[in-house]
Amino acid sequence: KHLFRSYHDMPKLEKKALDLARGKVLDVGAGAGCHSLALQKRMEQEQQKGSKAQNNIFSIKTIDISPLSCEAMKLRGVKDIECINLFNPQLGNDDGFDTILLLMNGTGIAGKIANLPTLFHRLKSLLNPNGQVLIDSSDLKYIYENENGCFDIDLNGPYYGEVDYQMVYEKTEGEPFDWLYVDFPLLKSIAESCGLEGELIAEGEHYDYLARLS
């Protein structure tokens, strides 16, 4: 049910990201397409009003690597869907994007902290001048907080935001995969090393945040 929610049911960070989207939009790892559908509705409303504001939505391209997700999105009414990997060189050949969305822990697709620069360089290559990446994540340090308020984190071990993830629905289990949560200071530092500016847009109620890379 969480994957099929409407704009009204989304957490405030996702609503904020959708409100900030503008121009030609790329929705990465769209899942069931809830964000693309919300943006489609907004774009249709803007067109009906004849609005020509600079922050209007002009187009929405939706991508996911799962054929089943793409089929579900098609059935739900998402219009421009492509079953393609973000790193496929065919993506973005024609033109860049003004807004790239990576929501529901957008850093996750990097898998490991060592892969984050590769992800950021790829996103940068897909941006138009003055374009933006809107990405959310969480700082998992709260998991390691002890009763004294200190954090028991092994600084010599792997980065604490690297986790093993597995999708389960009733008795059906997917294959485990690497998933990454990143604290904002580290995300900002890595983004800047890739030639991107990192900006904290908003914080959620439980160590989660929305950032803009530009």
How would you name each of these model-derived features?
Residues 117-129:
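A short glycine-rich, Lys/Arg-flanked "PGG" loop and its adjoining helix->strand segment in the class I
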Residues 129-186:
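SAM-dependent methyltransferase
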Residues 32-44, 54:
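Conserved SAM-binding loop of SAM-dependent methyltransferases across substrates and taxa
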